[in-house]
Amino acid sequence: NLILFVPVLSVSVYRTMDKIMLGWLSTYSSVGYYENIDKIINICLGFITALGQVMLPKSANLVARGKIEESNRLIVKSFKFSTLFCSALVFGLISISDVFVPVFFGTEFLPSIGILMLLAPNLFLLAWGNVLKTQFLMPRGKDMAYIISTLLGAVINTVVNVMLIPIFSGIGAAIGTICAEFISLIYILWVIKSDFDIMKFFASVRYIASGFIMMLGVVIVKQYVTVSLAGLFALIVTGAVIYAVECVILAYFKDDLLLEIMTIARKTIKHKLLRH
């Protein structure tokens, strides 16, 4: 079945295409700048795709048993969890990019900073697309919509790359990737809107707002740290503390997802303590 090859294709096609076209239309140094950031994004992407792989069997089972409403609730919960997780990653990467890149890659790779700041938000699009593909399209047999969304993204990416890479190099490739994932996501939302209340996804905006506030806090603290490993560590800790406090505040105001996460965490900790 062709659909079995699409998940593999959709994970790698855009950035693989980006690097190939960068080599054709720009310089080899621009490929290097892009390649380093691609590695970072791939690490983050691994956690995102893992969620889809874990939830696919459960979603398929619910649909097969006719429990559509329960399946829809699971999709909303997964969408919210992905947004909660990605908000920390996206705004964290953006806020520390100008420290992270010189510390890990060296000052000669400073052009990678702009690429990282552009590609980081793409994690939102990848995560949301992954949830909808693996928990809605695949379990409900909408294979063709899945394939079209991937091919549509590939076409958009190619067109934008041809237009922008000769002018903006790696930045142009990053813009092409974002455009591709955005159009692909919009197409999927259009496909599912008749069977699913997509307005429920807007409850996730609170996590994006929390991530943005965290980023502002890190940017303020960044004025007082050096471009060093210690400075980078201080920024990461600052961001983690701010985001954790925000999550506690949201839970206090009865955020259902965070209340569930905290309940599971308490039970897990209590169980482990009792075992010892």
Question: PLM features: what roles do these ranges have?
Answer:
Residues 1-15, 54, 58-73, 194-208, ...:
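Interhelical loop/hinge segments that connect adjacent transmembrane helices in multipass membrane
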Residues 5, 9-44, 61-62, 98-108, ...:
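Helix-terminus/linker motif at the lipid-water interface of multi-pass membrane proteins
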Residues 7, 11, 15, 38, ...:
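Short runs within selected transmembrane alpha-helices of multi-pass transporters and secretion channels
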Residues 11, 158-161, 213-227:
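Hydrophobic alpha-helical transmembrane segments in multi-pass integral membrane proteins
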Residues 28, 93-124:
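Interfacial segments at transmembrane-helix termini and the short loops linking adjacent helices
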Residues 29-32, 76, 110-113, 143-144, ...:
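Residues that define the loop-to-transmembrane-helix transition and helix capping
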Residues 37-79, 83-86, 133-139:
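Helix-loop junctions and terminal segments of transmembrane helices
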Residues 219-276:
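Membrane-proximal transmembrane or re-entrant/amphipathic helices at the cytosolic face
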